[in-house]
């Protein structure tokens, strides 16, 4: 499904003033009908007084870099974009299946509780209140998903811990809402999958007879020494997976890289021994 930006939106301020005028007029008609005992005036004034609040439901306010996906009786009507005060069909419903989903990212950080799990679903209730208002607007800003550290085996079978930060944004609101069940959860899962797929190709440090490019020739690629190349491959794989969800992956960066604690001491000793051997070779040469 392709995004359709609404072009027939109306000025919200003008429509609000019009509805206020009509509501005041309806009250005046109702009063006049009651005073002069005019049944038609009473009926007209009563009807508009009872339903005159409905058009106010169509008033929408958008901040910069926000969008609102609207449906009418289940059919996709279009996407409201650009900041401003607008009026649309009051029976239109805003749709955002990821509105309650909180990722460990900029834009979703709540009160500094960034140490929580990568994916936390809001319960919709808070202490002292029976329900919480859910904002159905979709942010078009660049956001950073800070993926938690994962333990993954490199191509030599050594367990390493690695974490990445992914900069992303929504580019097609219709695809994000209708092509996947929850685009935030989908992005998080694809980041985990891409990270595992790429890390398994590389050794932690440079190792002999290892082909990381897939051309059949051994190279010196490694997680520690080729971090930018590894991050680029992770970004490309994530982008390939989330393109159908209307998301753009701007950049991926490795934020943490280390051997897993259970082998860290052993690998450190091995690195030290290798460094001593290399130093002796240089002295001999």
Predicted regions and their residues:
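Long, charge-rich amphipathic alpha-helical coiled-coil "stalk/tentacle" segments
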Residues: 237, 261-285
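Aromatic-capped interface at the extracytoplasmic side
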Residues: 53-66
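Canonical alpha-helical transmembrane segments of integral membrane proteins
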Residues: 15-31
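Amphipathic, interface-forming alpha-helical segments with heptad-repeat character
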Residues: 92-96, 100-256, 262
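Membrane-cytosol interface motif
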Residues: 67-90
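Short Pro/Gly-enriched beta-strand edge/turn motifs at strand-loop
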Residues: 48-52, 144-147
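N-terminal membrane-targeting/pre-transmembrane regions
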Residues: 1-20
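Hydrophobic alpha-helical transmembrane segments
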Residues: 28-50
